[in-house]
A protein has these predicted regions:
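A conserved beta-strand element that flanks and buttresses the S-adenosyl-L-methionine
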Residues: 102
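Class I (Rossmann-like) S-adenosyl-L-methionine-dependent methyltransferase catalytic domain
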Residues: 1-96, 110-128, 132-196
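Conserved acidic residues
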Residues: 99
């Protein structure tokens, strides 16, 4: 995608991930807490987390080109981030590696139950007990496709049900995302804590 379009010309572009940042602040995590941004690619969330002095950041994306956009934008500051080109359904993290798992717009692309199960296994393994998971997907009245691909739309209850009893739902947020093309995409964010 990023080899054909500028980072600010894709439907999911945001100058700042304000909804995500507000939820991250609500967690009260410290600046040295381990944070992963799943599907972070060219997102500016990492810029804002670095500006807030977060020091243990991982950005995972399946697209090397998207990661390169962010690295180039950050310049020397990119060396403070762990960049991981991987498919989230295929990667295995060390146990309890992260205090915060953030995903805006990856989980809704997992239309296959087996892919969702692998994703959820990765979350369950990688997030510390007491850690937080913030996941943003298209809402029930959001788009049925993104970039020509089908997606699953969620309510807070159906999204939390995917994650199961090991995660306590702390809250939800809705976002009307205005795309660069002048359309509105309705997002739902769930904010959970891992029990145990």
């Amino acid at each position: 995608m990023y080899t054909h379009k500028a980072a600010d010309a894709v439907s999911w572009y945001q100058p700042h991930a304000d909804s995500s940042l507000a939820l991250i602040r609500q967690t009260g995590i410290t600046a040295d807490a381990a944070v992963i941004d799943v599907g972070g690619g060219a997102s500016t969330l990492v810029d804002d987390l670095l500006a807030a002095r977060h020091s243990d950041l991982t950005v995972l994306d399946i697209s090397a080109a998207a990661l390169d956009v962010a690295r180039h934008r950050l310049g020397d500051a990119a060396s403070a981030v762990h960049w991981l080109e991987a498919d989230i359904t295929q990667v295995e993290f060390p146990e309890h590696r992260f205090t915060l798992w953030h995903d805006r717009a990856v989980f809704h692309f997992l239309t296959d139950a087996a892919d969702r199960a692998r994703y959820l296994k990765a979350v369950g393994r990688a997030v510390k007990p007491g850690g937080f998971v913030i996941v943003g997907t298209f809402a029930e009245d959001g788009p049925e496709q993104c970039s020509g691909l089908p997606v699953r739309r969620y309510s807070a209850d159906t999204l939390h049900d995917e994650f199961g009893a090991q995660f306590e739902l702390l809250g939800k947020a809705e976002e009307n995302h205005h795309t660069p093309f002048g359309t509105v995409q309705k997002f739902l964010y769930c904010y959970c804590r891992k029990l145990g």
